[in-house]
Design a protein with these regions (language model features):
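Beta-strand elements within well-structured catalytic alpha/beta cores of enzymes
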Residues: 27-31, 61-66, 153, 174-187, ...
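Extreme N-terminal basic, low-complexity initiation segments
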Residues: 2-8
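Short acidic (Asp/Glu) patches
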Residues: 45-50, 94-98, 130-137, 164-167
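Internal, conserved structured core segments that host functional sites
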Residues: 109-163
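Short, positively charged and aromatic/hydrophobic N-terminal segments
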Residues: 7, 14-16
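Flexible, glycine/proline-enriched loop segments at strand-loop-helix junctions
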Residues: 95-103, 125, 154-161, 233
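Surface-exposed, charge/polar-rich loops and edge strands
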Residues: 114, 118, 148-149, 159, ...
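A short aromatic-anchored loop/beta-hairpin motif
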Residues: 18-115, 119, 123
Length: 286
């Protein structure tokens, strides 16, 4: 991790990454970002993400969709040096000292705006937005050197699974150009039970198992209609915003592209951390 005192030559870094020669399309990911403390407590998922980042190889940029930035219409962050946003309260002080100093990707952001507008989204650039914890916390593990250009895309307030799928399809061409697409959310997200229960609840694992079966089986219809089909869907997700980035990531996958499970286990008894990747090179055989 780059120390906060080391400056970044943003333009030089951006040009360096624009010149990368690709050997394969950049992957798409859904990452469960858990609680903000995941930034300091890697648990099972942290090392899995770091290994995935190494297998990913060279990419030109990373685009990340987080449920912690919701707007009227869609906003695409175009700042050349995004700040680290600590959009949470009541956590240990060292968490607020963490900075993720990756350069931004304004040219890629402009391209993403065009793709989204062509797909019917009311998309606009946002030159002032930094990276919220739904973005920088998982990126600390996936791209720990913080030298890959990154930019964030908001979720519209009226987002649903159909719109999330459409967003993923609209952004999918970026993968062939070397931009990794990351949907950051949570496989389960009942915060009341996290803070008031803390005990293992079987429904959370049942929902996680159902979702993995749908993702790994390529059952897009199930994901689009998870609210009616998944066990305990409304308990696992009292609100939808942390599930929808999964649908964005699945939408960015090529037709028939096989997903990989990135196992993350269960935290706080009910917060499932399993994540997924599409187009990620498989680990080399031992």
């Amino acid at each position: 991790m780059r120390a906060a005192s080391v400056p970044i030559d943003v333009r030089a870094t951006y040009i360096e990454y624009m010149d990368i020669n690709l050997t394969h399309p950049a992957p798409a990911f859904f990452i469960s970002h858990g609680a903000p403390t995941f930034a300091m407590q890697p648990g099972q998922l942290g090392p899995v993400l770091t290994a995935a980042g190494r297998r990913m190889g060279a990419i030109k940029a990373a685009l990340i969709v987080s449920p912690h930035w919701m707007t009227q219409g869609v906003r695409v962050a175009s700042t050349p040096a995004p700040d680290t946003i600590h959009d949470f309260g009541g956590f240990p002080e060292p968490l607020y000292q963490i900075r993720y100093r990756a350069p931004g990707a304004p040219d890629w952001a402009a391209h993403a705006v065009q793709l989204l507008q062509s797909a019917g989204f009311a998309a606009e650039p946002d030159a002032g937005r930094g990276l919220d914890h739904g973005a920088w916390v998982p990126l600390r593990y996936l791209l720990p050197e913080a030298n890959t250009p990154v930019f964030q895309i908001s979720m519209p307030r009226d987002f649903d699974t159909a719109a999330a799928w459409r967003m993923g399809r609209a952004l999918a061409p970026l993968r062939a150009q070397g931009v990794a697409i990351v949907g950051s959310g949570s496989l389960t997200h009942n915060l009341y039970e996290v803070f008031h229960g803390g005990k293992e609840a079987p429904y959370a694992q049942a929902f996680a198992n159902w979702t993995s079966q749908a993702v790994l089986g390529g059952d897009i219809d199930a994901l689009l209609h998870y609210r009616a089909q998944a066990p305990s869907a409304e308990r696992a997700h009292p609100t939808e915003e942390h599930f929808l980035p999964l649908v964005v990531a699945a939408g960015a996958a090529a037709e028939g592209e096989q997903a990989q499970l990135l196992p993350g286990g269960m935290t706080y008894g009910v917060l499932a951390m399993d994540s997924y990747a599409w187009g990620l090179p498989l680990p080399e055989a031992a």
